[in-house]
């Protein structure tokens, strides 16, 4: 059992004083408060009100976690007023206290908005923020801000030097296509480096800049990545991963042995995040992909999440020696709904990330702290058989706020659906739409029905389906929203991706689903494939939701394991009377464990 350090104790005292104060961002909810809306999440990060989008500058400093985020303090819509940096602090990544905005558009170099960027801890434990400012001429420039009092655990005040911008708009880049500086890393030559997204002469590019002092920056002649096909890319994230094990690495880690790098890019024309594992040479500032056959068009790279997320951002959590990922999950109903709720946008539940043994893909898993929210448990008998058409309810949990883990055993793959045309396997989302949960298959569909009404007129299906092409099997994972709501005007697609694993060898597949009212996050195959969805069922206004396990394949499957837990409500930017969890917990949890 670890002891709380002095920094954490000091942070606890500061948070106690903070929570005793009042602010428009952190007031106690009332009957009419937007926090009481039926679709508001219970343990996902979101401000008390108004618009949020990209996660920015997550870091751990002086015993506290910090999350900044794109925030509109004026409206639940993006385009009413100019964006600021929202700022919240936590001791456990679950419970959050909202602070006043960290950066506001008050200077000529950011007069029209403080857009996305990153945080870096400089020598001397000085936190620094690099961010994109929309200047008085509405051009995108890169600015720096420093913590005014680095010893303040809450980092409540930030200084924007008058010498900003530190990187002006380049002559070969349009004024609206130069943004999102990354977390900085130190090269072995002692120079700081950052990646910045830009469109250079019509080519989507990830530029590298170098600096001795974090103020004067020089651009590398060659980009880290460039593609004529992809369109504008955003929010670049270059970070190291260990070749073996689950531990994270400091962003500046490099070396010939034991370290790979990941380049993640967010693509505007698809609103999706893509990544490639490879090697990074800091002498030339060059990235070499491990799968060059995927090409320069990052839309053919691996997907970080096959669902409704964008603008992801990771950081190295030095406290737990892990890399943690956030991503923005926007609403998918209407702007009128945003205004009526008074808020828009949530962040995904934080995920631990590490490199799979194949050296090509990342594994993602909810951080272990979620176990502290688990309350009532329910499940099924091990070995429960699900025959063709079986639908079995899991009773005993509040299924609108739950954590569900299930492992399916596939007795045989003989009835897997045959696919003769390989082109049908190129678009998994289209395949999920054609082969939804209601379409009878051979091996699958089998999985979960979540946020379901008692009559099943509304439900979200999260499931697997096995296909066979020649002598190889392909495991498809889908989240089917077509029956998620009876409302018109709600985006209800079928999301999907292939799980990169040998299902013929294992014949077992795991599924973990986090349910949080309007958010459904699913992790297939131990985190090999992830799908995030936003759902808006109508029945929640008058009745409770239900949880089912099902099989609509002609072949039976077995439930080797199924456990479901109620999850408690975290304190997320709305004060409810105490500050439990806002300091780092003394109890260390067990190491992360995953199954196939």
Swiss-Prot record:
- Identify which residues the record assigns to the active site: 54
Keyword Cell inner membrane: yes or no?
A: no
Q: Which Pfam families match?
A: Glyco_hydro_32C (PF08244), Glyco_hydro_32N (PF00251)
Q: Where does the protein end up?
A: Secreted, Extracellular space, Apoplast; Secreted, Cell wall
The organs and tissues expressing this protein are described as: Expressed in roots, leaves and flowers. Weakly expressed in seeds.
Per the UniProt entry, the glycosylated residues are 82, 330, 552
Q: What is its main location?
A: secreted
Keyword annotations: Apoplast, Cell wall, Disulfide bond, Glycoprotein, Glycosidase, Hydrolase, Secreted, Signal
State the function annotated in the UniProt record: May play a role in sucrose partitioning during seed development.
Q: What is this protein called?
A: Beta-fructofuranosidase, insoluble isoenzyme 7
- Could you tell me which species this protein originates from? Oryza sativa subsp. japonica
């Amino acid at each position: 059992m670890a002891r709380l350090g002095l920094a954490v104790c000091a942070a606890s005292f500061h948070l106690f004083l903070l929570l005793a104060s009042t602010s428009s961002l952190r007031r106690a909810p009332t009957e009419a408060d937007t926090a009481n809306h039926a679709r508001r999440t219970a343990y996902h990060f979101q401000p008390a009100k108004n618009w949020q989008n990209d996660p920015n500058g997550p870091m751990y400093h002086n015993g506290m976690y910090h999350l900044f985020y794109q925030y509109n303090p004026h409206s639940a819509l993006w385009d009413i007023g100019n964006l600021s940096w929202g700022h919240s602090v936590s001791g456990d990544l679950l419970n959050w206290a909202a602070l006043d905005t960290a950066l506001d558009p008050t200077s000529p170099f950011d007069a029209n908005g403080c857009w996305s960027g990153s945080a870096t801890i400089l020598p001397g434990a000085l936190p620094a923020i690099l961010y994109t400012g929309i200047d008085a001429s509405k051009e995108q420039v890169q600015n720096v801000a420093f913590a005014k009092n680095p010893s303040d655990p809450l980092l409540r005040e930030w200084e924007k030097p008058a010498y900003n911008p530190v990187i002006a708009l380049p002559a070969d880049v349009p004024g609206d296509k130069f943004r999102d500086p990354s977390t900085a890393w130190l090269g072995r030559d002692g120079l700081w480096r950052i990646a910045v997204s830009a469109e250079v002469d019509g080519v989507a590019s990830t530029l590298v800049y170098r600096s001795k002092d974090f103020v004067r920056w020089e651009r590398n002649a060659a980009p880290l990545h460039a593609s004529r096909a992809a369109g504008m890319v955003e929010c670049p994230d270059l970070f190291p991963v260990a070749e073996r094990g689950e531990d994270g690495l400091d962003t500046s880690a490099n070396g010939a042995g034991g370290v790979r790098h990941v380049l993640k890019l967010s693509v505007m024309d698809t609103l999706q995040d893509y990544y490639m594992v490879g090697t990074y040479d800091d002498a030339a500032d060059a990235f070499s992909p491990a799968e060059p056959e995927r090409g320069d068009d990052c839309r053919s790279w691996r997907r970080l999440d096959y669902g409704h997320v964008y603008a992801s951002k990771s950081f190295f959590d030095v406290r737990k020696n892990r890399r943690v990922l956030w991503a923005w999950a926007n609403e998918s109903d209407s702007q009128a709904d945003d205004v009526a709720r008074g808020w828009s946008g949530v962040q995904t539940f934080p995920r631990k990330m590490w490199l799979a043994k194949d050296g090509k893909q990342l594994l993602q898993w909810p951080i272990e702290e979620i176990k502290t929210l688990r309350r009532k448990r329910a499940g099924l008998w091990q070995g429960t058989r699900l025959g063709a058409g079986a639908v079995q309810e899991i009773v005993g949990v509040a299924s609108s706020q739950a954590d569900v883990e299930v492992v399916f055993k596939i007795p045989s793959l003989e009835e897997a659906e045959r696919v003769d045309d390989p082109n049908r396997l190129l678009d998994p989302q289209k395949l999920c739409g054609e082969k939804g949960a209601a379409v009878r298959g051979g091996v699958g569909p089998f999985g979960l029905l979540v946020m379901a009404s008692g009559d099943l007129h509304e439900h979200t299906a999260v499931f697997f389906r096995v296909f066979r092409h020649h002598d190889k099997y392909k495991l498809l994972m889908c989240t089917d929203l077509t029956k998620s709501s009876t409302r018109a005007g709600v985006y209800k697609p079928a999301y999907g991706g292939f799980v990169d694993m040998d299902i013929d060898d294992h014949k077992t597949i795991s599924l973990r689903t986090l349910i949080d009212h309007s958010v459904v996050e699913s992790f297939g195959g131990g985190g090999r494939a992830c799908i995030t969805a936003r759902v808006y069922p109508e029945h929640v206004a008058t009745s409770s939701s239900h949880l089912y396990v099902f099989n609509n394949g002609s072949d039976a499957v077995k439930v080797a394991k199924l456990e479901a837990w109620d999850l408690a409500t975290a304190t997320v930017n709305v004060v409810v009377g105490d500050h439990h969890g806002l300091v780092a917990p003394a109890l260390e949890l067990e190491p992360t464990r995953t199954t196939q």
